[in-house]
């Protein structure tokens, strides 16, 4: 199972939110590229980047720090937030991004997801952010009637590389991930699932790894910044 350190970008800085509330942002590093290099030095194999402003604006906002990370870090990175058309997908992949994460458009324009997955095999993931089992879009600001598993299954044959499943009520709360919901989703689809939201300790990571659903990976942010999770130790434990 791959551990993805998260760098959430707001106003050019690396921050963490609680439950996705933009007014509850804690700045952890005003130099996101330096933060990324710290994670790489600790041995991470991937980086998970989110353009928070972009998620609300519907277009890239924090392009400069993302580009700096891509230029300076030699590990693959995935990015979500504000990627809602083919031109933006192509632009990011041309700049060296390994994988785009499509969230809002997966609900509003699923054909774009399928088109992108066909055009760029292995480089398109679907981000499913949920509150109480229902999908939320536009930076988690809008809740839909779409159920998580229904949305995931609709992309079963689309060729997407992964589903990144975030439980909004767990995100940034340091209360542990929603292991049951994540495992249920992973069992329901053949697409690799990456867990996000609530990972707060090494025990949480081990529980996800051992949940019996063959998760592809887990994303952690606040726990790494707060020191509740030691990245080197976590990477070693997951390899072991």
UniProtKB/Swiss-Prot annotation:
GO terms for cellular component: cytoplasm. The keyword Amino-acid biosynthesis applies. Keywords: Amino-acid biosynthesis, Cytoplasm, Histidine biosynthesis, Isomerase. The keyword Isomerase applies. SUPFAM superfamilies: Ribulose-phoshate binding barrel. Pathway: Amino-acid biosynthesis; L-histidine biosynthesis; L-histidine from 5-phospho-alpha-D-ribose 1-diphosphate: step 4/9. It comes from Ruegeria pomeroyi (strain ATCC 700808 / DSM 15171 / DSS-3) (Silicibacter pomeroyi). InterPro entries: Aldolase_TIM, His_biosynth, HisA_bact_arch, Isoase_HisA-like, Isoase_HisA-like_bact, RibuloseP-bd_barrel. One of its GO terms (molecular function) is 1-(5-phosphoribosyl)-5-[(5-phosphoribosylamino)methylideneamino]imidazole-4-carboxamide isomerase activity. Gene3D superfamilies: Aldolase class I. It catalyses: 1-(5-phospho-beta-D-ribosyl)-5-[(5-phospho-beta-D-ribosylamino)methylideneamino]imidazole-4-carboxamide = 5-[(5-phospho-1-deoxy-D-ribulos-1-ylimino)methylamino]-1-(5-phospho-beta-D-ribosyl)imidazole-4-carboxamide. This is 1-(5-phosphoribosyl)-5-[(5-phosphoribosylamino)methylideneamino] imidazole-4-carboxamide isomerase 1. It is an enzyme of class 5 (isomerase). The active site is at 8 (proton acceptor), 129 (proton donor). Its main location: cytoplasm. Belongs to the HisA/HisF family. Signal peptide: none annotated. GO terms for biological process: L-histidine biosynthetic process; L-tryptophan biosynthetic process. It is found in: Cytoplasm. The lineage of its organism: Bacteria, Pseudomonadati, Pseudomonadota, Alphaproteobacteria, Rhodobacterales.
């Amino acid at each position: 199972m791959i551990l993805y350190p998260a760098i959430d970008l707001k106003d050019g800085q690396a921050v963490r939110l609680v439950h996705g509330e933009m007014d509850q942002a804690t700045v952890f590093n005003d130099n996101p590229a330096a933060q990324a290099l710290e994670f790489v030095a600790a041995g991470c194999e991937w980086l998970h980047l989110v353009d928070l402003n972009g998620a609300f604006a519907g277009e890239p906002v924090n392009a400069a720090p993302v580009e700096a990370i891509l230029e300076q870090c030699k590990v693959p990175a995935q990015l979500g937030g504000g990627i809602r058309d083919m031109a933006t997908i192509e632009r990011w992949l041309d700049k060296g991004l390994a994988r785009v994460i499509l969230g809002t458009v997966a609900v509003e324009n699923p054909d774009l997801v399928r088109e992108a997955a066909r055009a760029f095999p292995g480089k398109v993931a679907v981000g499913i952010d949920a509150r109480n089992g229902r999908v939320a879009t536009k930076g988690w600001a809008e809740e839909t009637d779409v159920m998580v598993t229904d949305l995931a299954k609709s992309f079963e044959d689309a060729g997407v590389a992964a589903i990144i499943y975030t439980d909004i009520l767990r995100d940034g709360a340091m209360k542990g991930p929603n292991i049951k919901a994540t495992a249920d989703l992973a069992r329901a689809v053949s697409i690799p699932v990456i867990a996000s939201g609530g990972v707060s300790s090494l025990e949480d990571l081990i529980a996800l790894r051992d949940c019996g659903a063959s998760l592809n990976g887990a994303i952690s942010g606040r726990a790494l910044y707060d020191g509740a999770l030691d990245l080197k130790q976590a990477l070693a434990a997951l390899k072991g």
